[in-house]
Amino acid sequence: MTDLRHYDVIVSPVITEKSTMVSEHNQVVFNVARKATKPEIKAAVEALFGVKVTAVNTAVRKGKVKRFCGLVGRQSDVKKAIVTLAEGQSIDVSTGL
């Protein structure tokens, strides 16, 4: 895997109230590519941030149905990864890469 592939796997960090509360338990939340697997996510986080990952949990958030000027549309589904880091490791997602 090249660095370009790692950047393709991790789309963006998720910065919400719930994800900030989870960060107290050595966990970080990322939006990832829909086709990304748990081993690919683990390898990308370890390569890009230089940390040890102990677990990766994923969830797919289904897109909402939205209306605009009477037309019905649908937002895209988003895959979210909750990455658990080893004890004593941390990632500051607010500064970026």
Curated annotation (Swiss-Prot):
Keywords of this entry = Ribonucleoprotein, Ribosomal protein, RNA-binding, rRNA-binding
Q: Give an example GO biological process.
A: translation
Q: Does the keyword RNA-binding apply?
A: yes
Q: Give any Gene Ontology cellular component.
A: ribosome
- GO molecular function annotations of the record: rRNA binding; structural constituent of ribosome
The record's comment on protein family reads: Belongs to the universal ribosomal protein uL23 family.
Q: How does it assemble?
A: Part of the 50S ribosomal subunit. Contacts protein L29, and trigger factor when it is bound to the ribosome.
What is this protein called in UniProt? Large ribosomal subunit protein uL23
